[in-house]
Every structure is written in C-alpha cells, then in structure tokens.
C-alpha cells in the first residue's frame, strides 16, 4: 500500500488483510480461511529508525531485518498458523533520512557531493552501472567523480540509521555536454558566389542515365 495511507484492506476467498495506522502504531489483521492455517510472514517497509515493540496476538514477538532490502529497510515478522492473526508494531525515533531527495544533474567527469544527515551513516557502495569514477565516504559527506553516458543512472549506498540498515538508491542524471554539429544558416550564403545549374537534362533523362 502507499506509504501515506493510514488504512487499507484487501480480501480474497482464502485470506483477508487489513491495515490501520494511528500515530506511531501500525496494526495488521490477517484472517485465513484455509482448512489448515498457514504460518504468515509479514514483510513491511520501516518508517522510523527504531521499533519500540512488536506483538503478535498481544504477545511480544521478535522481528528480523532483511539485509538485501533496497529503497527502504524491510522487516520480517513471523506468526503462528492460526485462523486470525493481529500484528501490532510501535515505532519510535526519527524518520528515515534520504541522501538525495531530488535527482542531481551532473556533467560526465563532474563531481557529486552528498551530505550525510546526522544520525545516519554509510558503509558500502554498489555501482552496477559503473558511473562512479572514484568516490570517498566520510562521517558527514559522500563525494564522487561521475563518469558515463548521458541519461538517468542509479547507484546504491548501504545506509545505517538507528536499528535500520538498507541499500539506499541514489539517482543521478548525466547531462549531455557534447556540442551539436554546426550548420550554415541560409542567410550566410553569399549570392555573388552562386551560379545557375541547369537540371533539365537530368530531370528529363532516362532513369538509367541519371
């Protein structure tokens, strides 16, 4: 569901799923209609840097962070196989930071500088499109020299904030700095250098003679 929704539901003949949000508390209701209920696993995007508590059917439960998560931290919560399951998550701490809220426009061989927000840190870089000629990571800034063809590109930085870890995408646009070919404007033609050319002979000739 979209991140800004505070309630939603979906239902099929076999299962119903309902979600509600009130301030820092998210509640998920799962109803199964199988003869033998399955063990549901809830995977959700984190929306804050810490979790105050997780409960499954009012019983404290554990959660796991999925290491390969990208875009947002992804959490996994497993429940017992019952016909009705209620999972409650209480969040706390600061909202998750974004390194680049907008897509920077950079020339090839240009430089990219990103400020790392207070409370966050980065430890790794994954560059599948090879757009980073070189880069440095510090406690407060990420700097890189950009290379590559014009267009939209993405690389990823492994971000840590509070209890959350995830691969955060950084989108950049490499602008086209190549000069367009020059053309002579018709107004620049010098009439005294022009001469008449008779095409009648060619236009009226046989196709094999042209």
Annotate the PLM regions.
Residues 1-135:
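Non-catalytic C-terminal accessory modules of carbohydrate-active enzymes
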Residues 32, 44, 110-118, 124, ...:
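Aromatic/hydrophobic beta-strand junction motif of beta-rich domains
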Residues 79-83, 145-152:
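Surface-exposed, short loops/turns at beta-strand junctions within beta-sandwich domains
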Residues 85-91, 150-170:
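Short, aromatic- and glycine-rich surface loops/edge beta-strands on solvent-exposed regions
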Residues 95-117, 168-195:
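Low-complexity, Pro/Ser/Thr- and charge-rich linker/hinge segments at domain boundaries
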Residues 125-129, 143-144, 153-157:
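Long, low-complexity acidic/proline-rich regions
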Residues 129-148, 204-207:
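Immunoglobulin-like IPT/TIG beta-sandwich domains and homologous Ig-like subdomains
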Residues 140, 154-158, 174, 180-210:
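Alpha-helical solenoid repeat scaffolds
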